[in-house]
Amino acid sequence: TPPAVAAALSVRGTTLTGTGARGDQPPALHPLVQDFLDTLTSERRERFTGRCAEAVLLSRHLTEADATRTARSKRAARRPMTPGEARKALKGAKLTTRHIREDGDPLHGAFAPPCRSCTALAEHFGVRVIDPTLQD
């Protein structure tokens, strides 16, 4: 199970929020997100890879962008989204994650750095991970 974190993905004025997936079945990720995670070498994988809030939010955003792309063009509808189109859809994206803990736990609400897999995923798609505690 991934650590308990909440994440926010902001892309050009739109913000998606969510948490990691905790059920028996892993979440259905966007094919480009799943493909990237499937290619990670063992030293860049976590045992919960693909269940983190970051992977879930990137998938949600790309799924929405993909639906918009295919609705606009019959040609686009006949082929899957490319990694370049995904990066373009995520241009300027910022991602932050915070710990979810019990009331009174000093870690509750603190910045939660992404795991190795999500760090690589964010870099791959050009998404900036923001630590709000380092902002002025």
Language model feature labels by segment:
Residues 1-136:
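Zinc-dependent deaminase catalytic domain
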